[in-house]
Amino acid sequence: MKRIGILSDTHSYWDDRYAKYFEHCDEIWHAGDIGDEAIIDRLEAIAPVVRAVYGNIDGANLRRRLRPMEIFTTDGVKVVLTHIGGYPGHYAPGIRSRLDISMPQLFVDGHSHILKIIPDREFNLLHINPGAAGKQGWQTVRTLVIITIDAGAVKDAEVIELADPPTNKPRR
């Protein structure tokens, strides 16, 4: 059994709560738009395995260090991890053929800043977009996802909302 922490779209923003929520995870997956290599370094200090892909805002250093897509198997579950993927019925160009060829049980992407955990009946997989963990973007709630994989199946998914403390701005 493995616990996997999933995040995306940090856009160089680090929140110490990533470490708090992911401290008991066996792996952490970052679905791109990392922003700063230090984010990956900090995640590597939390979990023994970190898998990450670069996103459309990531610069040359991250593009040299990471790939745009990772395909791997963990605890019997085949996974495709990428940044721009779309969602069931509306996949980005090239993704449908990749899913056809790879036949994963789990497809993880980011980019939209929209949290989605939905089954894709056409490809017989679970689609997860963890939403955005960073502050850049239009999302109103920052999110992380933790899943449990056991004996070749995703057993559960937990959504974590990272509520920001209210600011004490003076009223005018």
Predicted regions and their residues:
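Structural signal for conserved beta-strand scaffold positions within catalytic alpha/beta enzyme cores
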Residues: 6, 52, 81, 129, ...
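Short, solvent-exposed aromatic-acidic interface loops
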Residues: 157-169
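Active-site glycine-centered loops adjacent to acidic/histidine catalytic or metal-binding residues
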Residues: 9, 33, 55, 83, ...
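Short, small-residue-enriched loops and turns at beta-alpha junctions
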Residues: 59-61, 88, 136, 165-166
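Conserved beta-sheet core of the metallophosphoesterase superfamily
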Residues: 89-153, 157
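Active-site donor-binding loop signature of nucleotide-sugar glycosyltransferases
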Residues: 74, 84, 130-132, 149, ...
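N-terminal active-site segment of His-dependent metallophosphoesterases
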Residues: 1-50, 58-68, 74-76, 81, ...
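Short active-site segment of divalent metal-dependent hydrolases/proteases
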Residues: 12, 36, 86, 114, ...
